[in-house]
Swiss-Prot record:
Cofactor: Fe(2+); Zn(2+)
Organism: Methanocaldococcus vulcanius (strain ATCC 700851 / DSM 12094 / M7) (Methanococcus vulcanius)
Protein name (database record): 2-amino-5-formylamino-6-ribosylaminopyrimidin-4(3H)-one 5'-monophosphate deformylase
UniProt entry tagged with the keyword Metal-binding: yes
Enzyme class: hydrolase
Enzyme Commission number(s): 3.5.1.102
Length: 226
């Protein structure tokens, strides 16, 4: 058998190869005029991949299905079980290449619905699983600013973006059912109605820097325990 040189390259140390990083977001979700429908998974992938590059942890890829609260209607989503099945597939393959611990970088609020199932998945697959949630008011200033930094925001369409009748999902301002059912969503929508949506590259860079550092720190903590 070929000897794999675990200590090669710019990595924290060879223990980092036992840690796998997965991106979780959504692929089919309206984000107004400025942002694409797969904004969440692109942001999650950017954060997860950069944390992997900085540490040497294995970037295992992206989860394709996503889920959402029933009362939030701004995209096409899947069942919680479908996400868990996809994670089983990814994690089992990760185990075959030496991964023992999983960090999920999630950038879609609806996916927090899977968290209560992760302990059972850990026991079933005999791995450690931890989810880091990095979410924003939907399609609003923070998300648009992050999107501008990573190159996915079409800022020329910002004025159109805040037409809440045409794009009710922006800030969830026009998603009446979601606002009725969730006071946090309603509060965020009120703030967007009042303040609008702005593009702030400095804010976007700061959010990304802090998010990547958060994942890197978690990887470092896991290595320190090994």
């Amino acid at each position: 058998m070929v000897e794999i040189r675990l200590s090669s390259g710019k990595i924290l140390n060879k223990k980092v190869h036992k840690i796998g990083v997965i991106a979780l977001g959504s692929f089919l979700e309206n984000h107004g005029a400025v942002l694409p429908i797969d904004t969440d998974i692109k942001i999650a992938s950017y954060i997860a991949l950069n944390a992997s590059i900085l540490t040497g942890a294995k970037f295992l890829g992206v989860v394709i299905p996503s889920t959402e609260y029933e009362y939030v209607k701004h995209g096409i989503h899947n069942k919680v079980d479908e996400i868990l099945d996809y994670l089983r597939f990814m994690i089992n393959w990760g185990k075959k290449i030496g991964v023992e611990e999983i960090i999920i970088v999630n950038c879609h609020g609806g996916n927090v619905l899977i968290e209560e199932h992760l302990k059972n998945l850990e026991k079933e697959l005999d791995v450690s699983i931890e989810m880091i949630n990095i979410t924003f008011t939907h399609a609003s200033t923070e998300e648009v600013s992050v999107g501008e930094v990573i190159g996915i925001s079409d800022v020329k369409r910002l004025e159109e973006h805040t037409n809440f009748e045409k794009y009710p999902e922006v800030g969830m301002v026009g998603l009446k059912e979601a606002r009725r059912n969730n006071p946090i969503i309603d509060q965020e929508a009120k703030e967007v109605e009042t303040s609008g949506v702005k593009v702030d590259r400095e804010l976007g860079r700061s959010i990304l820097k802090n998010a990547i550092e958060k994942v890197v720190k978690k990887i470092e903590e896991k290595i320190a325990k090994k």
